[in-house]
């Protein structure tokens, strides 16, 4: 299903509620550039075999709601640019994501300029190697919750991970890289959820 609705920029509505996705392995760029979509119901998607979600919702500028609570991401390795340029999303619940196999989270939330909070408490980032531009231009983001599963040990590229995240506590435009991907009390931008 990679690129299935790629650059369907005139599309204002889309009924995909009857899609059988149980055998799908790739959803790269599936809705990329659907810039006029306001709502998109993917709540019934079976993603249990999907291994890559690169740019899946990238450029869905007007999307105001996205229910991903039933997404099974245990096989996914690539989440780069997954929500890139979802500028109208004010809320995004990804707390149920299994990220244990993910290696690439680069630009995952870039230009999600209305998001105020993200919950990574169930995120296992021990295999992630790329977090470049992950939160770039998330100007309203005030809180990023993490747990003890959060690890940057394998990351080799974290360039401008927090660039323009000016609402994060203690933000400094000179400090936007991996050195800030730690708890606030240790000099970073992240919050331990209690």
Question: Predicted regions span which residues?
Answer:
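Negatively charged
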Residues: 2-194
């Amino acid at each position: 299903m990679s690129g299935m609705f790629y650059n369907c920029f005139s599309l204002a509505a889309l009924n995909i509620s009857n899609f059988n996705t149980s055998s799908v392995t790739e959803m790269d760029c599936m809705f990329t550039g659907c810039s006029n979509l306001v709502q998109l119901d993917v709540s019934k998607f079976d993603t249990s075999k999907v291994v890559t979600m690169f740019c899946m919702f990238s450029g869905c500028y007007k999307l105001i709601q996205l229910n991903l609570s039933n997404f099974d991401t245990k096989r996914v390795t690539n989440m780069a640019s997954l929500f890139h340029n979802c500028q109208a999303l004010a809320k995004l619940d990804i707390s149920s994501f299994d990220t244990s196999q993910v290696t690439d989270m680069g630009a995952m939330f870039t230009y999600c300029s209305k998001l105020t909070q993200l919950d990574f408490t169930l995120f296992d980032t021990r295999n992630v190697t790329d977090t470049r531009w992950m939160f770039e231009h998330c100007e309203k983001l005030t809180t990023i919750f993490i747990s003890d599963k959060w690890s940057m040990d394998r990351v080799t590229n974290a360039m401008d991970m927090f660039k323009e995240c000016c609402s994060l506590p203690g933000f400094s435009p000179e400090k936007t890289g991996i050195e800030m991907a730690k708890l606030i009390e240790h000099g970073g931008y992240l919050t331990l959820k209690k």
